[in-house]
Amino acid sequence: MINHITDNQFKLVSKYQPSGDQPQAIEQLVDNIEGGEKAQILMGATGTGKTYTMSQVISKVNKPTLVIAHNKTLAGQLYGEFKEFFPENAVEYFVSYYDYYQPEAYVPSSDTYIEKDSSVNDEIDKLRHSATSALLERNDVIVVASVSCIYGLGSPKEYADSVVSLRPGLEISRDKLLNDLVDIQFERNDIDFQRGRFRVRGDVVEIFPASRDEHAFRVEFFGDEIDRIREVEALTGQVLGEVDHLAIFPATHFVTNDDHMEVAIAKIQAELEEQLAVFEKEGKLLEAQRLKQRTEYDIEMLREMGYTNGVENYSRHMDGRSEGEPPYTLLDFFPDDFLIMIDESHMTIGQIKGMYNGDRSRKEMLVNYGFRLPSALDNRPLRREEFESHVHQIVYVSATPGDYENEQTETVIEQIIRPTGLLDPEVEVRPTMGQIDDLLGEINARVEKNERTFITTLTKKMAEDLTDYFKEMGIKVKYMHSDIKTLERTEIIRDLRLGVFDVLVGINLLREGIDVPEVSLVAILDADKEGFLRNERGLIQTIGRAARNSEGHVIMYADTVTQSMQRAIDETARRRKIQMAYNEEHGIVPQTIKKEIRDLIAVTKAVAKEEDKEVDITSLNKQERKELVKKLEKQMQEAVEVLDFELAAQIRDMMLEVKALD
């Protein structure tokens, strides 16, 4: 782990003061951390300000903090909130940078090799580099991460040792700087200037760090000495100011110096010889030939370029690790005494525990059939016990802590009172007969009051059918499914809050951390279908989605009341009783949360254009909308005639959205 010398302080900026039972929760958590307690649970009901409590704790204990969330949507939301609370500190975002990812795999039954295929999101890659560089430069850092943080990342020591440090007056030739940049995987491109690239114009070298997306640095030489360094606008070249020191971090997290690379290549060759001998002994000549060809190509690429596709599969040799030794991860970039907070821990812990086995079974197949060396098995996520070995102090945060958390600690700090005085919603059970028409009436009542609705179903088909039906009924509705890209998810939540649409339908995406105060109705279909999505914890989480609005109401559609339903209803009633008593004692009238609607993370231009298109539609008058519907109908017919039914369906959905505005 990395240790720092700097001693920056966290500075919490908020117009709020702790209220309700937040002050006691903050005090207990801080006292326990300062007293050396390793693990504790913050059991906070939905909407009680758990994120604010977490921020207060981080500010008071002043430790670098890793906040782990179980999905990218929740991580994006937390990132936005922490950035607002800590504008002067480094708040970073670290999730998987793949918009699409098909891992390398082999299916022996059909003799099918599936090559790794992926689409990397440039914005998220930039944020990942920003996170690791911040951890090496300062100690006032909060990293909000998904479970990606337990996957192999490359050695933090190699990463830190590879930093190119520049300052005015430094004696270094221009060519030496260019070589140093190439060594840390920067690419020279004098025409297309992007992140992770540099360009040269005479005695001027312009460098675009991997952790930036708008600003680059211009290094001006006088002979073999740096004359000055300027920060510039990458697009226009406008000078923003001069800098006294510039640290250029590697353009990739998997970086190795020349000496270590030679040692690594020797080890890869030795392992290749061993594995070829094993295959030949077993009569697996095809596998031996395949492995020899692939590995020798990779070795040649590593020797000539210092990099190859799938370089992470050789990370054990490049890091100098022993067989079976855990890989370096984001956790190794933190100092020894850092703090971990696991948000929605009842979900996140399950993911941390399950990642290793799925990865292992896929890679074993690749090794057995000669697609990878056995050392590829050590490019993997951490096991649960390996993750635990990184834990110095940890806070599990959840409205419904799981069995694992309760086994780790008996220290449970409850936070039930909401600062706004909001109560847990009233829950009622209605029969399934006529449920859709009943629900339609409830939605229309909310639309009239400019309130939003969440609907959770059990199957993808039901969610799609329900969405189509409500569109036909003139409801502005969207379906949030698992195929939606990372940054689009946060945009959907934002659009719901802005009123671009009124109803959001989903399966398992609505339960934890989707923070929409405008939602006053949560409808749970098939509430009596006992299982993962309808157990006690799941139902309590779903009920909590309506707890941020003073008109919050939950309808469970079911023909019988299961034990899980009853326990969830009873727990909600218990909390509601405590909250009502507190409000009565302090003369508090419940008020819906007023929360600023903001862009959580900068989105791509394509998404921005799409958003502009939606804004234009809403600004059209009735006659213009009528003409637009006619045009869309014509386009839909043309798409059907050329058998492009997918396009036709998209146009149909757009048409229904326009009609819903009337």
Swiss-Prot record:
Organism in which the protein naturally occurs: Streptococcus pneumoniae (strain Hungary19A-6)
Ranges where the Helicase ATP-binding domain occurs: 31-188
Protein name as catalogued: UvrABC system protein B
Chief place of localization: cytoplasm
GO MF annotation, one: ATP binding
Motif (Beta-hairpin): 97-120
Key word Oxidoreductase present: no
Gene3D superfamilies found in the cross-reference section: P-loop containing nucleotide triphosphate hydrolases, UVR domain
